[in-house]
Amino acid sequence: MTAIYLNLTMAFSLALMGVLVYRSHLMSTLLCLEGMMLSLFILMTLLITHYRMSSISMLPLTLLVFSACEAAIGLALLVKMFTSYGNDHVQNLNLLKC
C-alpha cells in the first residue's frame, strides 16, 4: 500500500513542478492544477477507505466539486484571454483592469 501512496505523492509533486515550470502559459498551468487535484482526490479517497474514517467520507467529493468549479472558471478565463489577446500568456492577465 505504501507504493501507491508514494506514486500519488510523486504525481502531486510532478504536477506542482509543472505549475512552477510552465507558469507562462495558462493552459499548461490549468492542466497541471487538474493533475494536482486528481492526485489529491485519489490519495484522500485511499486514505479515508484505508483508515475507515466514515465521518469525513464526503471530503473527496467536495474536493472534486471545487476542482470542477476551478476548471470551469479557468477555462472561461482562458477563452476570454484568447479572444482578447490572441494567446494564453499569463503576463497578459492583469487583475487591475476591468
UniProtKB/Swiss-Prot annotation:
One of the record's GO molecular function terms: NADH dehydrogenase (ubiquinone) activity
Gene (name only): MT-ND4L
Top EC group: translocase
Cellular component GO terms, alphabetical: mitochondrial inner membrane; respiratory chain complex I
Record function comment: Core subunit of the mitochondrial membrane respiratory chain NADH dehydrogenase (Complex I) which catalyzes electron transfer from NADH through the respiratory chain, using ubiquinone as an electron acceptor. Part of the enzyme membrane arm which is embedded in the lipid bilayer and involved in proton translocation.
InterPro entries: NADH_UbQ_OxRdtase_chain4L/K (IPR001133), NUOK/Mnh_C1-like (IPR039428)
Highest rank taxon of the organism: Eukaryota
Keyword flag Transmembrane helix: yes
TM segment ranges: 1-21, 29-49, 59-79
Subunit details: Core subunit of respiratory chain NADH dehydrogenase (Complex I) which is composed of 45 different subunits.
Keyword annotations of the record: Electron transport, Membrane, Mitochondrion, Mitochondrion inner membrane, NAD, Respiratory chain, Translocase, Transmembrane, Transmembrane helix, Transport, Ubiquinone
Reaction catalysis annotation: a ubiquinone + NADH + 5 H(+)(in) = a ubiquinol + NAD(+) + 4 H(+)(out)
Topology with respect to the bilayer: Multi-pass membrane protein
The protein, known as: NADH-ubiquinone oxidoreductase chain 4L
